[in-house]
Amino acid sequence: MTIIHPYTALGTTKENRTSRASFAKRALRTAGPVLAASTLVIGLAACGSDDGDDNSGNGSSGGTDFEPVTITHALGEAEITEKPERVVTLGQGSAETALALGIVPVGTEEYEWGADESGYLPWVHEELENEGVAEDDYPELISAGDSGVSAEEIAKLDPDVILAPWSGITEEQYDSLSALAPTVAYPEKPWTIDWKDQITTVATALGEKDRAEELIGGIEDQFASVREENPEFAEYDFAFIYNQGATGDMGVFLPSEQRAAMVENLGLAVAPVVEDMKSQEKEGTDSATFSIENADILDDVDVLFTFYSDEANREEMEALPTYGAVTAIRKGAVVAPTDNSFVTGSSMINPLTVPWSIDRYVPMIKDAITHL
């Protein structure tokens, strides 16, 4: 069975190529990608001390003023009493915000499916290069493995705080992690968080709450520019769908899910059928599922956004009469990128992925609407 997990991309390892049924079983359950970080100051503004001392190298993220904070989340509370110097992030997107705040991870989850030739996600790699970080200080690539987060591996990093606001850590994992350091989990449900809340949570935990508005404002300005330059986008609605192979169900991402939120922020309207499916959310996916036999519920949607695990997955889906007959599929009003890095980057809204993604996204959307 071919499957696309809403939050973790299909890998390219031998196991994923040869055992997709096994992957399908674990992909829609709690995932455990690991991103570990310690602080390394880079010249990204507002992170150094005012006295001009050299703060390069591992250590404090700059400045001694820090107001203790308590962050309440679904699994408990994280009391952070001192400015973190060794930060671990789990799940997706939080490491990018840390980088935008001037903190370079010393360890990052190995994300083969979306990585460039260096082994890093390209927007992360570009940020490291742009900031002149020595290769010896690049994050170490860490594999989470099938079992998810390893508390033993995290313990080796001696963290001051563990950030997992967009993750799927379980209560058992949380108990192990919080024994190591204050741990911030998701606000309410696994793998579900508003992108603004994620940025604010990470910034607050790192003693940079005042900069959260700056980062959010910068992202909103970029979205606004796209809408102003492409007013025609507002004339069309969309649904962002995924498939679980020819014999599995289909899914539609809800508006709060970050990849759907990105498209909406670029100017398209959420299709009514998506709004109607909010009550059918499958916990831990920020999406709702429906049978392929009912694919015609998408017939009134102007533009469909989707992605496939590979060309074989695309072909098997388009060969299905019920799927191939959907209006947008039939007309070609579909945005279905084949670049694994883009699929990954466009699934997250944060200070690094948005500028990297939107210039690539706009031409795809323009092409899709020419088919309407």
Segments predicted by a language model, with ranges:
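Bacterial lipoprotein signal-peptidase II cleavage site
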Residues: G43-D65
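Alpha-helical, coiled-coil/dimerization segments enriched in small aliphatic residues
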Residues: V252-D286
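A short, structured surface patch at a secondary-structure boundary
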Residues: A95-A151
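Structured C-terminal subdomain patch of bacterial secreted/periplasmic proteins
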Residues: L298-L372
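Proline-aspartate-enriched helix->loop->beta-strand connector
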Residues: I154, D158-A164, P182, A295, ...
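Extracytoplasmic substrate-binding proteins
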Residues: E77, S176-T247, S347-L372
